[in-house]
Regions:
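Bacterial N-terminal signal peptides that target proteins for export
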Residues: 1-8
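Acidic, polar-rich low-complexity tracts and alpha-helical solenoid repeat scaffolds
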Residues: 2, 18-189
Length: 189
């Protein structure tokens, strides 16, 4: 009985050694042209998925394009498109995350005006009314002020000024809401 186990053990050991023996190995090289083609394909797939309405897959493809070739001109574009994909379907927190990552990675990119505008719009779209928290309101105003101060010659500056006027009206409504509350409670300041 014991010898049967020894023979079985030896056969298994030989099979293991034989399967691990050196065979001709195929080493695949990643050619830069292939990487650029993969990056381009990922960007195109992301764009098609965005048009179809599958924003999660689109954002994944845009992020994939950015990761495949981070030094290309398409990397920053892919990061913005991933954020836009989330924004287009009201995934504002995901869009904010993508845009903050974009600003860390590409602080001096030519599309920063649009990225600030998109970030401002993400915060702006989360404004409910004057009775709610002011954080998204103030964050939105901050982004629009950056556009006016740093990118005043872009087409986004006009819209940013308009949005700031609307935000100021909401802030004034908030002050009126607070004043009415204290008047109703007869809590004179």
């Amino acid at each position: 009985m014991c010898s049967k186990f020894k023979i079985l053990f030896i056969l298994i050991a030989l099979l293991f050694v034989w399967s691990c023996a050196d065979k001709e190995k195929k080493i695949s090289k990643i050619v830069e042209a292939d990487m650029e083609m993969q990056m381009s394909n990922a960007y195109k797939e992301g764009y098609l998925e965005l048009q179809r309405g599958d924003v999660l897959l689109a954002a994944k493809k845009f992020n994939e394009a950015e990761l495949l070739f981070p030094q290309s001109i398409w990397a920053a574009e892919s990061a913005i498109m991933a954020a836009y994909a989330y924004y287009s379907q009201n995934y504002y927190s995901d869009a904010v995350y993508e845009l903050e990552r974009y600003f860390e990675t590409y602080p001096n990119h030519k599309d920063n005006a649009y990225a600030h505008f998109l970030l401002g719009m993400c915060f702006y779209e989360q404004i409910v009314d004057e009775k709610k928290d002011l954080k998204s309101l103030l964050d939105s105003k901050k982004q629009f002020e950056i556009i006016i101060n740093e990118f005043s010659s872009t087409e986004f500056a006009v819209d940013a000024k308009f949005k700031i006027n609307l935000i100021d009206e909401i802030l004034a409504a908030k002050e009126m809401y607070i004043a009415r509350y204290y008047l109703d409670k007869t809590k004179w300041i």
